[in-house]
Design a protein with these regions (language model features):
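Chalcogenol-based redox active-site neighborhoods
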Residues: 1-198
Length: 198
């Protein structure tokens, strides 16, 4: 992994093709929310399939908790769709057969020249693509458990949600004055929030 990809740095805003053939940037997919980014070997790898199956349940929680999940692999668009459908995932999968991310981050898995995948990583991102934590998943047990990711999201949300603890006197006073700027959805309508999630 590139030396500048560390906690506190801003992760590159890659633009890739999603499972539906649409060009997407990571920042657009993230919106104003925390995001878990999975850099995957691809659908051929049983470890990655098992990891994605585990993420299906967490993703249901992330949807109601206003957090995002994205997977990037070096698979082509057909294999990307087979991978996504095969694990019953409902989050965006990005296809990078040109290995833009692999090359830019210097994470070619040189021990597998036949598939030439990325070394698997899971990156927890604060809003603005700010790196909170990086997990190296070359070995399966280097990858975070669902509970570790849940704890990471809790820590990130505590940092980025000004209304994390609405029992504080200052927030109560804001609410009573009609000042809703520090309360979710932070000056937006719910219609705008739901539109951003598409």
């Amino acid at each position: 992994m590139r030396a500048d990809i560390v906690a506190g740095a801003v992760f590159p805003d890659y633009e890739l093709t999603d499972h539906a053939g649409k060009r997407r940037t990571l920042s657009d997919l993230q919106g104003p929310d925390p995001m878990i980014l999975v850099l995957s070997r691809g659908g051929y790898c049983p470890k990655d399939l098992r990891q994605a199956q585990g993420l299906v349940q967490l993703h249901r929680e992330m949807e109601v908790g206003y957090a995002r999940l994205v997977t990037i692999s070096t698979d082509n668009i057909i294999t990307t769709n087979e991978y996504r459908t095969g694990v019953d995932a409902h989050w965006p999968f990005l296809s990078d057969p040109g290995r833009k991310v692999q090359k830019d981050l210097d994470i070619a898995e040189y021990t597998d020249p036949d598939h030439n995948p990325m070394i698997p990583h899971v990156i927890v991102l604060e809003p603005g693509l700010v790196i909170f934590k990086i997990y190296n998943g070359y070995w399966f047990f280097g990858r975070p458990t669902i509970e570790e990711l849940r704890q990471d999201l809790r820590a990130v949300l505590r940092k980025c949600r000004p209304d994390w603890d609405i029992a504080t006197p200052a927030l109560k006073a804001d609410w009573e004055r009609g000042d809703r700027g520090r309360f979710y959805p932070y000056g937006k309508t719910y219609g705008q929030v739901f539109q951003e999630q598409e």
